[in-house]
Regions:
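Primarily recognizes the serine-hydrolase "nucleophile elbow" in alpha/beta-hydrolase
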Residues: 1-43, 59-60, 64
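Short, hinge-like loop/turn segments at secondary-structure boundaries
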Residues: 17, 45-46, 124-126
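Loop/turn elements at helix/coil->beta-strand transitions in domains of secreted/extracellular proteins
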Residues: 23-26, 72-75, 101-106
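Acidic catalytic loop of the alpha/beta-hydrolase fold
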Residues: 36, 82-86
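Active-site nucleophile elbow and catalytic-triad environment of alpha/beta-hydrolase enzymes
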Residues: 52-67, 72-73
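Short beta-strand/loop motif that positions the catalytic acidic residue
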Residues: 71, 76-79, 83
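C-terminal catalytic histidine-bearing segment of alpha/beta-hydrolase fold enzymes
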Residues: 88-127
Length: 127
């Protein structure tokens, strides 16, 4: 389970595991950073992980939507469509890759909430 940059870590564990013993059984991602593609990544997360001068090979290796296989564990992804910190395309493209590879996945998109709502009592949908 991971939120924001922690979502990148959780999706890394789910797509880069070395053998079946280290493969997670499932992944829960909240408004995750998934890609390192410059056009829609979270720049701060990208720079912190890869540095400012990352190669194209590094960018692709750490763009987890490109690393999904039929063996990737099932996923539950939650985000808000108005997230201005981590573009929703991170989650949408990851979900699409999971489905294209036959991996069971569920995605819920709240219409409002922005980023980081899991830690805010003011989140509209929090009970």
């Amino acid at each position: 389970m991971g939120a924001s940059a922690g979502g990148h870590l959780a999706s890394m564990l789910s797509t880069h595991y070395s053998d079946s013993a280290s493969r997670p059984d499932f992944q829960v991602l909240l408004y995750p950073v998934v890609t390192m593609d410059r056009s829609y990544t979270h720049k701060g997360s990208r720079d912190n992980l890869l540095g400012k001068n990352a190669s194209e090979e590094q960018e692709k290796r750490f763009s987890n939507e490109l690393q999904v296989t039929p063996s990737t564990p099932q996923a539950f992804i939650v985000l808000s469509s108005d997230d201005r910190t981590v573009p929703p395309a991170n989650s949408v493209n990851y979900y699409s890759s999971l489905i294209a590879n036959g991996v069971p996945a569920t995605m819920h998109i709240y219409p409002v909430g922005g980023h980081g709502w899991g830690f805010r009592d003011s989140f509209k949908y929090k009970r």
